[in-house]
Structure formats: C-alpha cells, structure tokens
C-alpha cells in the first residue's frame, strides 16, 4: 500500500510546516501546498490498514527535504522534521511489524536535492569541488541564472528540474554513499525493503 506521507494523515499538528492547510480545505491543492501529513498520522491508521488486509507499506520519500513530495532529498540520513523524527519512524516500523506489515522506503537514488551539502559544494567550489564527479555536469559554473530553457541546464537533472541534479551512479563514491544510506536504514531501523 503506497503512502504519500504529506497527504495521508496529520497525527501531530505541532510539527506541521508553517502555513499548512486544513485537511478539509476546499481548494484545489498545488504542488507547493502542505497539509501536514506525518509519520504519527500513519501510525494512527495502522489498525485501519490492517483491517483492509494490507501487508506492506511503501512510503514515498521521508527524508529531509524542503518540498512536500520530498523527492529532492537534502539528507538521506535524517527524517524530515515535518514528518517526525527517527524515534517516530522506529515506532512506525515496530508497530507495523507487530501487525504483520512490511515497511519499504522509496529509494530516490537517481538524483538529490539542490540544497544538499554535496550539490551546494559544487555550486560554491565549481570545478574544485570534491563532489563534481558525483553529478553529470556539462559545464561550470552550474548556475541557472537567466536560463530561458530548462533543457539547457549545465547539468543533468531529473525532469529538467534544476532543484533535482542527477547523481552519477557509476561513480564508486556515489555507489558507496548510497549503499551506506540503504544499509543504515536496514540495520538501524529494521526496514524490510527499498
């Protein structure tokens, strides 16, 4: 059962993003809107999901990110603060397992967020960046200022969106980093799959 956490259920309004909309809003949601869904909201509905016969939960990205969709990750080792924290995630995994449900995380390893430390190092240091080979860069600087056509980005990006630079997954350093991420969540939180 796939869950988009930001829109599933708000179990802890205290951690909702500033300006989060009410759940019963009659507006047509925009891609920039937040409603405050979180991990506690999922925990609160585990009995309901179990009653439906659900045996696995596939969570869209839950990692630190400024967007509502979280596909532009800034830190793969942190839960986004608007979703909760590592202890609330641990609680979700444990309670799901008690109900016979598996937990799968969305492995967004094709690209990373432009606010990630790795990409920001490339922006700041250009060709001298220790991370320049982590990405598919055509030319320096990697600025998008005055860019008339997204297809002319000086680097490859997911969906030509400048805030999601593509990772060079052939690079051994990138592979090692992503394997550390995957291993961390399995070993520390007992997730079942990516």
Language model: regions and residue ranges:
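Substrate-binding/active-site clefts of carbohydrate-active enzymes
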Residues: 5-55, 62-190
